[in-house]
Amino acid sequence: GGNRKAPAAPALSAFEQAATAAGLTAAPGKSAVENRYRGSVEGKTADTRFTGSLDMDAAFKQAEPEANRWDFGIGMRKPGKQEFAVWVEPHSASSLGEVKTILAKLDWLQGKLDQPEFRQLKALTDACAAQGHRRFHWMATARVGIRPGSREANMLAARGLNPPSTRVVI
């Protein structure tokens, strides 16, 4: 009886499928996020699921060594809701000059999301906004030197970013 079926592989999440379509390999849960930052990305409720993650920086480092690359994409799902993607960039926020770097990284990421092979990741990113969440997050790696209401904070807000924060809670 060599007719036994192999056990079915677990169904890929929408985030994992979207990553594959973009030619990338998603890691399970939040595991693509560097260990020291992983615990600082959390769901507002305990039943939030992390459906996959991408290390964009590592994926494009060789092809685009000089680019200001965004770091991490994370798939999330809340009960009864559509899966969505958020993008997290751990980066120093100690000086105002870092704002330009973050905005350059955001330009890079949005350029990727506009490419045809990233269409599914863009749709998941749009689903994030449709559920009332910020799509892009600057995670401060230390002291935050950017004050709410400052010119720099306003520049970030104009691009859909909150001022940097040491935790990302969605």
Predicted regions and their residues:
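Acidic-basic catalytic patches of nuclease active cores, encompassing PD-(D/E)XK
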Residues: 1-65
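Short acidic, S/G/P-rich loop/turn micro-motifs used as interaction or catalytic elements
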Residues: 60-64, 92-97, 143-148
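Conserved alpha/beta core surface patches that mediate binding of polyanionic ligands
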Residues: 66-70, 109
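Ser/Thr/Pro-rich, acidic low-complexity intrinsically disordered regulatory segments
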Residues: 67, 77-79
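Conserved catalytic cores of phosphodiester-cleaving nucleases, focusing on short active-site segments
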Residues: 72-74, 84-95
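Mg2+/Mn2+-dependent nuclease catalytic core
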Residues: 94-113
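Short, basic/hydrophobic alpha-helical segments
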Residues: 110-130
